């Protein structure tokens, strides 16, 4: 799609073309879509993430587990890690968890199993490479799949991720050495866990809060007692 640079480097036209390909890929278009758009600019392309999601929903309804695993594997190869997780896996997870149609529970279970299975294969491959060790601790989650999607995203950024998936309300202990420690908050953080985070931070530990909701939240039993 992009010709190699000459001795003087890439031309302006080549750089423009490369940026266009990147933008199309970030929009969830396939290589076939991008090739068509480059060669026939007047063609209106269907596709994008919505079509990729529809393809997976069809597989979850009708196809074998191997077909589902193969599709996830190819999607992870064809798209960058952040786009794959943020624009594809997370919207699919949300859709499946709000779906009330017939067979919804089975589709969600198959999706969760496929995501965890993909993570296990990626983690095994990462152990064979020279990658940066990172400890991902679930402080709180809104569902059982989100911590594994985040682990896949971090793997795509070049980390070798150890996951503590159970949000138990007490600090998790890593089994391996790590250079970074991320505390994932999908549904807030309790005052006690926030205090532990602050103490670790003040001690100079390589720790950071991350996730979709890092607000301090009181435990529900405390709220009930004060109501």
Task: Locate the predicted segments by residue.
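Basic, Lys/Arg-rich alpha-helical nucleic-acid-recognition elements, primarily the DNA-binding modules
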Residues: 1-45
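Short secondary-structure capping/turn micro-motifs that flank functional sites
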Residues: 40-41, 92, 170-171
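Charge-rich, acidic-biased intrinsically disordered regions
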Residues: 44-46, 137-138
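Generic helix N-cap/helix-start motif at coil->alpha-helix transitions
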Residues: 48-50
């Amino acid at each position: 799609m992009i010709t190699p640079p000459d001795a003087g480097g890439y031309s302006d036209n080549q750089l423009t073309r490369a940026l266009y390909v990147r933008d199309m890929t970030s929009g969830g278009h396939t290589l076939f879509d991008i090739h068509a758009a480059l060669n026939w600019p007047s063609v209106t392309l269907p596709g994008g993430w919505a079509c990729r999601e529809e393809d997976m929903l069809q597989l979850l309804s009708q196809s074998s587990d191997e077909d589902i695993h193969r599709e996830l594997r190819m999607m992870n190869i064809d798209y960058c890690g952040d786009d794959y997780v943020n624009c594809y896996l997370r919207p699919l997870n949300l859709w499946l968890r709000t779906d009330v149609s017939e067979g919804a529970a089975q589709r969600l279970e198959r999706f969760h199993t496929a995501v965890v299975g993909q993570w296990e294969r990626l983690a095994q491959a990462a152990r064979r490479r020279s990658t940066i060790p990172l400890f991902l601790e679930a402080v709180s989650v809104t569902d059982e799949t989100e911590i594994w999607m985040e682990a896949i995203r971090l793997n795509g950024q070049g980390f070798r991720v150890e996951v503590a998936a159970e949000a138990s309300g007490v600090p998790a202990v890593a089994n391996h050495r790590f250079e970074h420690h991320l505390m994932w908050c999908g549904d807030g953080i309790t005052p006690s866990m926030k205090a532990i985070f602050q103490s670790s931070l003040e001690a100079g530990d390589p720790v950071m809060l991350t996730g979709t909701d890092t607000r301090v939240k009181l435990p529900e039993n405390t709220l009930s007692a004060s109501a």
